[in-house]
A protein has these predicted regions:
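Short, positively charged and aromatic/hydrophobic N-terminal segments
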Residues: 4-5, 26-30, 42, 47-50, ...
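Acidic/polar hotspots within intrinsically disordered regions
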Residues: 14-18, 44
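N-terminal secretory targeting modules
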Residues: 30, 35, 40, 49, ...
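Conserved SGNH/GDSL esterase-like catalytic core that processes O-acyl groups on lipids
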Residues: 123, 190-191, 231, 237-335, ...
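Structural recognition of the beta-strand scaffold that forms the well-ordered cores
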Residues: 217-221, 226, 263-267, 312-317, ...
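Sec-exported extracytoplasmic/periplasmic mature domains
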Residues: 226, 260, 264, 319, ...
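Extracellular serine-dependent O-acyl
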Residues: 352-357, 365-402, 411-430
Length: 430
């Protein structure tokens, strides 16, 4: 016993005497002896009683495994006494999100910090051209998922999900020269509070002027279908998850890309034009017409400046949530939709506006919706000839379903294939 006590009391004068260090020292001493010491602490006497028992070498391996497991548990319990690790400093040229050569498409706010871009609508896009052979992206930890594309090549998904996950490599080992990066936020960031903080370039490199964004501009106003809810899932019974939502794969992005147009997506799962999903029959106050006025969804301290983005085309896909459960009032739906059309027209006086019906509603509710929108369009056309109608075909399951019966990736491609010819002709965008 004397050898145990002497070894236990030998401490480096620079060593920190916290609980975890003492525990580790005890384990190391035990492993160096031929004796395993079982420690029993009597709660009421405040002292330690030690009893010895010799074990042969064959049993020692089992004991070591048990002690190692104990060490792991103890280290977790004593985590408060252990200093957190420090990451290596970021090497390279840091370019802030406020850099004038970074291009944004979508509703982005710099109100809280002039060097940090805040956003939470899917489809928000960041583009830049840069010198060098690598590119890193800086975001607030847990910002969520992006699709990234370098020099127009195959897009790939990146994520910021851990507590300290703030730097992600987008490109490495590129040929030296000038390259272009496009990054799109592909989920709904309402609860994540996403922030883009900048890029990291190779030492001595900088951003250069990027190619001009397309002159063609579209705005999609919609619900979970336009967001891309569950599009990466292949099981209709799957719940909502950020991991399976992806706006890049939606009809909205496919159509915009095919038309060589930039687009914004003002969309949110569960939103309605008068009543959100399964809301009261009288309607919800926080519906799309109310949220539409603000830069960020459900954050109402900053009104959006509609002069920043004036689309030539607006596509509205709302009504699935209003009518998807039986507790709805079709007259209130029509009344609010008429008012919302007037709001959109006031923001975009020269845009063509297309009212869409989606593929998810049942036949009865879909028929009611189409009748209402046809009537709104006909009435509007008496004074405004730039209001139009379009119906997607119903999803039948032959192309599969995404999560919660939402359109699958193949269904979104079909939707894009249906909508594209109509919009090409309407806009004369060949």
């Amino acid at each position: 016993m004397q050898r145990y006590n002497n070894n236990l009391n030998k401490k480096n004068k620079n060593e920190k005497n916290d609980g975890f260090t003492c525990f580790l020292r005890e384990i190391m001493v035990i492993l160096q002896t031929d004796t395993v010491l079982f420690l029993f602490c009597k709660k009421n006497e405040g002292r330690t009683v030690r009893t010895d028992k010799n074990y042969n070498n064959r049993n020692m391996k089992k004991i070591w495994v048990m002690m190692l497991a104990t060490l792991m548990v103890s280290s977790t319990m004593m985590a408060g006494n252990v200093k957190k690790s420090t990451t290596l400093p970021i090497e390279g040229e840091i370019v802030k999100a406020s850099h004038p050569m970074i291009q944004y498409v979508g509703r982005v706010s710099f109100a809280k910090n002039p060097d940090v871009a805040s956003f939470n609508y899917p489809g928000t896009t960041i583009e830049a051209s840069f010198q060098g052979s690598s590119l890193k992206m800086l975001c607030r930890p847990k910002t969520g998922y992006f699709m990234a594309q370098i020099d127009g090549c195959e897009p790939f998904k990146v994520g910021f999900n851990a507590e300290r996950d703030s730097v992600v490599t987008l490109a490495a080992a590129l040929p030296k020269g000038v390259h272009h990066a496009k990054v799109m936020y592909v989920i709904e960031g309402l609860f994540r509070k996403p922030e883009f903080r900048g890029f990291v370039l190779d030492k001595g490199c900088q951003l250069v002027e990027a190619p001009a964004l397309p002159e063609r501009k579209i705005e999609f106003i919609g619900n979970s279908i336009t967001c891309g809810y569950g599009v990466e899932s292949i099981n209709m019974s799957d719940p909502f998850e950020d991991e399976t939502e992806n706006h890049w794969l939606t009809y909205a992005n496919i159509v915009s890309d095919s038309l060589k147009a930039q687009h914004t997506s003002i969309s949110r799962s569960g939103i309605g034009v008068y009543r959100n999903y399964n809301g009261p029959k009288t309607g919800d106050a926080d519906n799309m017409p109310w949220q539409y006025e603000y830069t960020l969804f459900d954050q109402h301290d900053e009104k959006w400046d509609f002069a920043k983005y004036q689309p030539q085309l607006v596509c509205i896909n709302l009504g699935t949530n209003d009518l998807s459960t039986k507790n709805y009032d079709i007259q209130l739906y029509e009344k609010n939709y008429r008012m919302f059309i007037k709001t959109v027209r006031s923001k975009y006086p020269h845009a063509k506006i297309v009212m869409l019906t989606g593929p998810m509603l049942g036949e009865k509710e879909s028929s009611k919706q189409r009748t209402v929108l046809d009537r709104i369009c006909a009435d509007a056309n008496k004074t405004d000839k730039n209001i139009y109608r379009f119906d997607f075909s119903f999803q039948k399951g032959d192309l599969g379903y995404g999560a919660s019966w939402h359109p699958s990736m193949l269904q979104h491609r079909k939707m894009a294939a249906e909508l594209l010819p109509f919009l090409r002709k309407l806009m004369n965008w060949n």
